[in-house]
C-alpha cells in the first residue's frame, strides 16, 4: 500500500488540478467530498497507461465494463475519474466519505484503504454466478479466485480437498462449481469478506460515519465462523449431538482422542490409584479405578479437541487476513505490479 501513499507532491497532478479548481459537479457530476475526490483521482491515475484505462487489473476490468455500459469506452482520465467515483458510491454507499474532509494526512490514507478494502469486499459478492446445480465464474476474475482457492488449500481442515486434489486445480478444470463446491467456496468468501470488513473498519471511522459498508451481514452477533469446535470436530458442523447415540459416539471419540494424547506423551496428569490392601481386585476399587481412568482419558480428549479447534480457528483467521490484504493489492495488480516489486 506504500505506493498509494497520499502526499502533497503526488497530489499535484493535472488531473487533480482539473478536479479541484473547477466545481466537481461541472466535471464529473459527483458530489463527493474533497478528500474522496483526491482518492478517486489518485486511483484513476494508477489505472491509466498511455492516456487510456489499463483494463489488465481486476479494478480496471470492472471500470472498463462500467464505462462501456455508459458509452464511455476508450475515454480519457476525466471519464475514468467519473466512472470510478460512480462505482465507489454504487458499491460503498451514496454518502461514503462524506465526513472525510475534516481529516488530513493519515486520514486521507485511511480513506484510500477503506475504498480499496470496500471495493475488494464488494467484488467478492460478484465472483460466482448462480446456475442450475451450482455456480459458474468468469476467467476475468481468476486473479481473485486463485487467491481464494489458495486460502482454501492452505486450510484443508476447514475446506477438505475436492476430487481434483486441490481448489486451485478445481478452478482450472472448468468454470463450474457444483452445489457442495459452491457451498465451500462461499464459506471461504464469507470468512475473507469478514476480514476485509474488519480491515476497512480498522482503517478509521471516516467512511463508517458517512454511509460505508457497515457490519457484514453474513455474520450475526451470535454466530461463529468455526461453529461449535467441540461439536464440529466430533459430530460434524450443524449437528447438535443431543441424541443418546450421538452422545455415546462423542464420548467414545473423546476417550480415544485422550488415549492418543497419553500415548504421545501427554500423560493423564493424575496417577491411577493402586488397589488398597484387603480390597478385591474385582470389587468396588477396580470399578473406581476404571472410572478414574476413563474420566482422565475423557478430560485429555476434551483438552486436545478444544486446543486443536482453537488453533485451527486462529490459523484460518490469520490466513484469511493475509489473503484479504493480497486481494486488495490484486485490485491494481495489472498496473502497479512492477512498481511494487
From Swiss-Prot:
Q: Mutating residue 102 to N has which effect?
A: In strain: NV
Q: Which Pfam families match?
A: Harpin (PF04877)
Which keywords are on file for this protein? Host cell membrane, Host membrane, Hypersensitive response elicitation, Ion channel, Ion transport, Membrane, Repeat, Secreted, Transport, Virulence
Provide the residue intervals of the sequence repeats: 210-216, 265-271, 276-279, 311-314
Q: What induces it?
A: Regulated by HrpRS and HrpL.
Compositional bias (Polar residues) spans?
216-225
Give the residue spans that cross the bilayer: none
Start and end residues of each stretch annotated as Disordered: 199-228
Q: Per the UniProt entry, what are the Gene Ontology biological process annotations, in alphabetical order?
A: monoatomic ion transmembrane transport; symbiont-mediated perturbation of host programmed cell death
User: Which segments carry the region annotation 2 X 7 AA repeats of G-G-G-L-G-T-P?
Assistant: 210-271
Just give the chief location class. Answer: secreted
Any one Gene Ontology cellular component term annotated for this protein = host cell plasma membrane
Q: Where in the cell is it found?
A: Secreted; Host cell membrane
What are the boundaries of the region 2 X 4 AA repeats of Q-T-G-T?
Answer: 276-314
Assembly mode: Homomultimeric.
- Give the UniProt family note: Belongs to the harpin HrpZ family.
Free-text comment about domains: The glycine-rich region is characteristic of harpins.
Record function comment = Harpins are proteins able to elicit hypersensitive response (HR) in non-host plants and are required for pathogenicity in host plants. HrpZ forms ion-conducting pores permeable for cations. Such pore-forming activity may allow nutrient release and/or delivery of virulence factors during bacterial colonization of host plants.
Q: Tell me what this protein is called.
A: Harpin HrpZ
Q: Which organism is it from?
A: Pseudomonas syringae pv. syringae
Amino acid at each position: 500500500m506504500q505506493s498509494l501513499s497520499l502526499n502533497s507532491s503526488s497530489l499535484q497532478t493535472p488531473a487533480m488540478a482539473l478536479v479541484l479548481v473547477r466545481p466537481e459537479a461541472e466535471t464529473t457530476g459527483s458530489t463527493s467530498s474533497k478528500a474522496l475526490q483526491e482518492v478517486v483521482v489518485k486511483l484513476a491515475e494508477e489505472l491509466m497507461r498511455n492516456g487510456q484505462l489499463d483494463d489488465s487489473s481486476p479494478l480496471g476490468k470492472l471500470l472498463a465494463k462500467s464505462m462501456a455500459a455508459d458509452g464511455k469506452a476508450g475515454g480519457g482520465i476525466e471519464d475514468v475519474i467519473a466512472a470510478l467515483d460512480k462505482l465507489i458510491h454504487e458499491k460503498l454507499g451514496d454518502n461514503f466519505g462524506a465526513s472525510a474532509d475534516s481529516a488530513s494526512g493519515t486520514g486521507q490514507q485511511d480513506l484510500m484503504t477503506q475504498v480499496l478494502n470496500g471495493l475488494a469486499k464488494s467484488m467478492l459478492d460478484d465472483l460466482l454466478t448462480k446456475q442450475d446445480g451450482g455456480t459458474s465464474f468468469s476467467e476475468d476474475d481468476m486473479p481473485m479466485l486463485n487467491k481464494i482457492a489458495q486460502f482454501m488449500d492452505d486450510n484443508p481442515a476447514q475446506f477438505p480437498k475436492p476430487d481434483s486434489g486441490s481448489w486451485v486445480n478445481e478452478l482450472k478444470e472448468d468454470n463450474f462449481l457444483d452445489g457442495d463446491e459452491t457451498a465451500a467456496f462461499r464459506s471461504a468468501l464469507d470468512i475473507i469478506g469478514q476480514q476485509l470488513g474488519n480491515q476497512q473498519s480498522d482503517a478509521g471511522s471516516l467512511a463508517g460515519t458517512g454511509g460505508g459498508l457497515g457490519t457484514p451481514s453474513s455474520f450475526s452477533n451470535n454466530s461463529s465462523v468455526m461453529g461449535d469446535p467441540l461439536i464440529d470436530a466430533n459430530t460434524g458442523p450443524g449437528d447438535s449431538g443431543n441424541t443418546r447415540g450421538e452422545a455415546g459416539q462423542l464420548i467414545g471419540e473423546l476417550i480415544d482422542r485422550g488415549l492418543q494424547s497419553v500415548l504421545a506423551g501427554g500423560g493423564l496428569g493424575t496417577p491411577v490409584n493402586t488397589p488398597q490392601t484387603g480390597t478385591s481386585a474385582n470389587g468396588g476399587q477396580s470399578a473406581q479405578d476404571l472410572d478414574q481412568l476413563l474420566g482422565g482419558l475423557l478430560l485429555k480428549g476434551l483438552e486436545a479437541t478444544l486446543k486443536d479447534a482453537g488453533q485451527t480457528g486462529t490459523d484460518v483467521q490469520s490466513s484469511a487476513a493475509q489473503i484479504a490484504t493480497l486481494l486488495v493489492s490484486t485490485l491494481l495488480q495489472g498496473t502497479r505490479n512492477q512498481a511494487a516489486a
